[in-house]
Amino acid sequence: CLGITEIDPERSNLLFERFISRERNEPPDIDVDFEHQRREEVIQYIYDKYGQDRAAIAATVATYRTRSAIQDIGKALGLDIERTRRLSASLAWWDKTSDISQRLAENGFDPDSPVIQKLIQLIPVLYGFPRHLSQHVGGFVISRDKLCRIVPIENAAMADRRIIQWDKDDLAAVGLMKIDVLALGMLSAIRRTLDLVSARRDAPFRIQDIPAKDEATFDMICKADTIGVFQIESRAQMSMLPRLKPRSFYDLVIEVAIVRPGPIQGDMVHPYLRRRQELEVVEYPSEEVKSALKRTLGIPIFQEQVMQLAILAAGFTSGEADQLRRSMAAWKKKGGLSPFHGKIIDGMTSRGYTSEFAERIFRQIEGFGEYGFPESHAASFALLVYVSAWLKCHEPAAFLCAMLNSLPMGFYSASQLIQDARRHDVRIMPVDVTVSDWDCTIEEQFDKTLQSAQPDVRLGLNRVKGIGLEAAKRIVEARKISPFENPIDLANRASLNTAEMRALASSDALNTLSGHRRQTLWVVASHIKQRDLLRDAPIRETSPAITAAREGEEIMADYASMELTLRRHPLALLRPELARMNLNSAIELDNYPTGRLVRTTGIVTCRQRPGTASGVVFVTLEDETGITNVVVWNQLVLKQRREILNSRLLTVYGVWQCEGEVKHVIAKRLVDHSHLLGNLKVESRDFH
């Protein structure tokens, strides 16, 4: 009724007690997601509406982690700052305090030194201890009275912001209501895509205009062709999609929620998949349990289902069930579930359930302490999953354009998004000062020989390192008056300095005006410094003809200036050498039977080590033909840590596994072949 969500809670059968109940003596917790690029606009709106003295952002307590503990303890003990920094940087995101001794030895420290022994002793003591106050990601407190009369306030480092010096737990203790003003990059991307589609169709196009059950979209999702799609673009989600095979909106709700630490730790994922594939019979001990778990085949996946089980099967009141929900997230920190154990077991056994079933339900509830997902959140996220998937499927050019303009967000870099779009027959045009705006744009194809129904994507000046928004605005405004004659004319009329002109030349954005990159760099270097003295004098000197760089050098220059290339993939140039090494491409692996020994190589684009994966690292490799997923078991991670962490070009010897659309290499040996890339700098994104 407020119009802030597209999800109908009644139609979706969402549990109202999850939001509010009679026994809850406090207002509900409210989270509202906004476009990440407009979040500051919303924050300033709140300050303007309620006043700086009645609205402020909550604090969060930043605690010591291993790296920060090493650096601060090292300073206190008088250790060399640079060596301490190197030690801290050598730690992987998964390293524990128990790994410090080995890292010390690797970085040239003497583990037996009294000072180093003191360092080793103090790190676990300091770990988890409060270090400083930081700003909450979006927790706003709005009060009727002046906040300074209730809580301590300080000015934030960022202009026009004020911070409460208490965290969310402190605020809850005094009964202050917090509203989370959160930023979601996909909202920016979707809004931008809809704007582009509306402009192209010359008619408004809204989320509501997207068909509800599009078979092509679900086909794409089931094949895990979801790079860039909200929530289901991670390795774990892409691995789950061909197994779960979503064919409806509610399937997407389950998909969003099931690949979470809660269901994984609670041993809910595999039983659900077996039942979905009709490999296991679905049985319910009672009609009450069936009413709560029927939609998820007898497996509790959502927080609301745990609350319903507590109410229907264990005799909890709505308020007690909500207290159980609150305790689930805190049980590891505060032991909050122990008081509920007896009540759950006794309540269920007194109603005829076996103690074994009751204990299993309690263990699954404990699993939700590892971040189980509310069905209401999953439903809202599933809508964004479907919308973004539909846009990627049917409007890939507009979707790519919007994604590039919404970065940074998600799992993938601009280069990876572009490579994926090209595999979907989207043509990307280079940055060009004669046509590019600040943002990337879409252009209708004027080449009638092309059969694609999609427009081209023109890269914007925002892709060029060293060019800011103000410089781009000056370029566009000057271009509106008359076309640029040459780079010097551009520099004069757009008031560009030497660094900005060099950035444009390095990115090949001046190609239309003065030829290839080397030629343009020479023109800029030889003439730009003279322009202030001889601004109105005609340039009579003829530039010498300079040979264009080789393709490999051009690709390296592209990555250095924009972190992407529209030329051939770097591995296309290396393919003859890789073939001599008997290394398979990604597309060749697709034709192999499961269980075959394979060897492949690719640029490392992503490393993931989920906390629920028992030390397993998932690596994504990219070559000119596609993507290869690699699974590295913990034993090999420990043995070849350096190759996993430092390789830009990683060669994997292993076993090919293929089950339907689920395909990956189980690594047996890793080799770092980064030297083959020379000075090419490629971006890898690491998640945990």
Summary of predicted features, one role per range:
Residues 1-688:
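Noncatalytic, beta-rich nucleic-acid-contacting surfaces in large DNA/RNA-processing enzymes
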